Regions:
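Short, solvent-exposed secondary-structure boundary/capping segments
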Residues: 94-102
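A short, compositionally biased
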Residues: 60-61, 91-95
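Hydrophobic beta-strand signal
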Residues: 64-71
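Short beta-strand-centered aromatic/proline hotspots
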Residues: 75-92
Length: 181
């Protein structure tokens, strides 16, 4: 199967448009381009030639990954993301904890990304809805490692695959968690 060039095509388009990476202007530009793409599937991302596929996590802390996931307690959870975008924060028995940026609306996602990239971010309470535990036994694919230069692109790709609820409910619940601390 041919490899796609989603990440490099977007990077080249940004360069041609004179967009400086990791700026407010670039965040707005990538959000607009992502909206124009429509739905992006995991297959599209997995076939991208810039994405490194891994069978297991090697030195995962602080790295961003995408993967297919089938929550162990999917029948009792109100919803979950079956294709999360996770920055791994810690290892745990049988899995890991991470920040799934898909749980944040795009504006807050941009601010969270700024914080993760080392510039002005959000207060800690804003990350609360993104913190999730993932069990490695429930991962249903290889791990797609997203290199830091592509974090900005990956953050705004419309790739979340919600099970149990729509994106509107997820964002409302996330905002509620932020307000309530």
């Amino acid at each position: 199967m041919a490899r796609s060039n989603l990440f490099s095509d977007l990077e080249i388009a940004a360069f041609r448009a004179g967009i400086t990476p990791r700026t407010k202007e670039s965040i707005a530009w990538f959000k607009q381009k992502a909206a124009q793409l429509g739905k992006v599937t995991g297959g599209t991302i997995f076939r991208d030639e810039q994405v490194k596929m891994q069978n297991s996590l090697r030195n995962p802390l602080g790295n961003m990954y995408m993967f297919y996931y089938n929550a162990k307690h999917r029948n009792t959870l109100p919803y979950f993301d079956a294709f999360p975008l996770v920055v791994i924060t810690s290892l745990a028995e049988g899995g890991f904890y991470g920040l799934n940026l898909h749980y944040l609306p795009p504006q807050l996602r941009a601010k969270a990304l700024n914080g993760l990239m080392g510039s002005e971010g959000l207060p800690a309470k804003y990350y609360k809805p993104t913190i999730h535990r993932y069990l490695t036994t429930q991962v249903r694919s290889k791990f797609a490692l997203i290199d830091k230069p592509e974090w900005e692109i990956a953050t705004f790709l419309p790739a979340a695959q919600w099970r149990g609820a729509g994106v509107g409910k997820v964002y409302r619940d996330s905002r509620s968690k932020m307000r309530n601390g």
